[in-house]
């Protein structure tokens, strides 16, 4: 599909591709940006993002059992109000699917606004853990792009050292355990 196509990535034209992925039981990583090409500007980023989540929810219902990861986190900056991230309730709907995971990498979106260790992000990270579960959250680096805001170690230490509300088991899930399970990697 190109930007001029009215079809979305879940269209009938792509059904054979998705059916093959489903048969192979491969994990899928989706980056939701709230539209493609000129469609991005047809409505607000917030509305477009939620609409794209609904497309993903339909896809998840069509292909149950596949592990899916929403990459790059949620649209943190779109919902930033007075220094706090305030998501609407419906942003959590796709995570009602037990196989939908969330990759979190705060520095790439918020590094220009907040300083390490990004304490301002902790309330929304805590909420994500409460709503989704650490066993469905994956730490992401976005290296080398994130290096303009922090080191690799700092990005990792956000979850290894900071976020005091996390248990040791939750930390292990977020910084590797969840990704290992999604990818089918066993020790």
Task: Show which residues each predicted segment covers.
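Catalytic pocket-lining loop regions of alpha/beta-barrel enzymes
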Residues: 4-138
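Residue-level detector of flexible, active-site-proximal loop/helix-junction positions
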Residues: 75-77, 144, 181
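Mid-to-C-terminal alpha-helical segments outside catalytic/metal-binding sites
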Residues: 126-127, 131-138, 147-187
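Conserved, mostly hydrophobic/aromatic
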Residues: 21, 102, 142, 171, ...
């Amino acid at each position: 599909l190109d930007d001029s196509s009215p079809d979305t990535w879940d269209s009938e034209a792509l059904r054979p591709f998705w059916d093959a992925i489903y048969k192979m039981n491969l994990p899928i990583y989706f980056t939701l940006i709230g539209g493609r090409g000129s469609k991005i500007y047809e409505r607000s980023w917030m509305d477009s993002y939620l609409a794209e989540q609904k497309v993903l929810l339909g896809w998840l219902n069509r292909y149950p059992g596949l592990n899916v990861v929403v990459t790059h986190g949620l649209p943190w900056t779109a919902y930033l109000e007075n220094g706090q991230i305030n998501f609407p309730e419906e942003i959590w709907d796709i995570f009602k699917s037990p196989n939908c995971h969330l990759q979190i990498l705060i520095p790439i979106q918020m590094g220009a606004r907040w300083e390490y260790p990004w304490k301002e992000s902790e309330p929304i990270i805590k909420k994500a853990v409460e709503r989704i579960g650490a066993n469905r959250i994956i730490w992401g680096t976005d290296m080398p792009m994130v290096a303009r805001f922090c080191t690799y170690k700092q990005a990792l230490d956000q979850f290894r050292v900071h976020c005091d509300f996390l248990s040791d088991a939750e930390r292990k899930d977020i910084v590797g355990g969840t990704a290992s399970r999604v990818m089918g990697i066993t020790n």
